[in-house]
Amino acid sequence: MAKLKFDELGKRFYETGVSEAVLFPQDPSGTYPKGIAWNGITAANESPSGAEANDQYADNIKYLSLTGAENFEGTIEAFSSPEEFDECDGMKTIAKGAVAHQQNRRPFGFAFKSILGNDTKGNEYGYKLHLWYGCKAAPSERSHATVNDSPEPQNLSLIHI
């Protein structure tokens, strides 16, 4: 049996950051024809759910264990969103400066890069491309506060399924 090696030089990896986000509004045919740069992304959180074990018994013993389907859920946090995202978030411009909320939400895709690093090359090791598809925005809270002596930009938290 081969001896296990731990903490080898160049084999201690990590992942960090979120950058170069792209929105892909879905067209009526179900395709994603055009990507739009999304500036101001502060976080992209992936929260899968499901995949629960379902034990089955026969002859007084555990016969098998079936695993349920996994569902993807994610949250995008950003200082702003591109104008093209408004339709995906249930907003429609009805006149200059007037927006109607609670409209039908357009499905979309989303992509972003995260940095891959290791103990020898640091953050220059590489990157990972994350692709989300079939997303639909869910309503989320938005707070508007008065400007004061320590203002903070509004941070949108957009929940997607």
Predicted region positions:
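Polar/acidic, low-complexity leader/linker segments enriched in S/T/G and N/D
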Residues: M1-N45
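Extracellular/virion structural assembly segments
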Residues: K3-L9, K62-P151
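Alpha-helical protein-protein interaction elements
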Residues: T16, G30, S49, A100-N104, ...
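Membrane-targeting and insertion segments and their boundary/processing signals
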Residues: A43-G50, K128, W132
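N-terminal "mature-chain" segments and other terminal, solvent-exposed stretches
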Residues: P48-D59
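Terminal interaction module
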Residues: Q154-S157
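Conserved small/polar residues in nucleotide/adenosyl-binding loops
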Residues: H160-I161
